[in-house]
Regions:
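Cys/His-enriched microdomains
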Residues: 88-91, 109
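Interaction interfaces in information-processing and related assembly proteins
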Residues: 1-84, 122
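Short Cys/His-rich "knuckle" micro-motifs
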Residues: 100-105, 121-122
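Hydrophobic alpha-helical segments of small multi-pass membrane proteins
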Residues: 95-97, 110
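Cysteine-rich micro-motifs
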Residues: 107-116
């Protein structure tokens, strides 16, 4: 189901075309992260066969995989929000996330203001 979100001004309004383009970007990101995870999983086996896997390399692989899984989960969640009609709404203040922000970070859960507040609290 594609939602036509009318929030008010053009900065926050997501047209059906905007949603379709963002959905395509999210699908591409999902495929990229899935492929990245496959490559990360395959790399240690190849290194072990060659007997060249160091502890530092293993740690890098673990951190890369964790990061890829986290981004993949964010992408999957964004696609689910698109499906259920809540995409583009900030999880904290419930206001619309600016179209420009979603274009840059299509999996964004928070508007720029709430994201800054969250990051300042860390």
């Amino acid at each position: 189901m594609v939602n036509h979100q009318t929030v008010g001004d053009r900065a926050t309004h997501l047209s059906p075309e905007d949603l379709a383009a963002l959905r395509e970007i999210l699908h591409e990101q999902r495929l990229f992260r899935q492929d990245q995870l496959r490559q990360i999983a395959a790399a240690p086996r190849a290194e072990e066969l060659l007997g060249r896997r160091s502890a530092a390399q293993a740690e890098v692989h673990v951190k890369l995989a964790a990061s890829a899984r986290m981004v993949l989960a964010d992408v999957e969640a964004a696609l689910q929000r698109m499906a259920d009609g809540s995409y583009g709404t900030c999880h904290l203040c419930r206001r619309a996330i600016d179209r420009e922000r979603l274009t840059i970070v299509p999996q964004a859960r928070y508007c720029a203001r709430c994201q800054q507040v969250r990051e300042a609290g860390r």
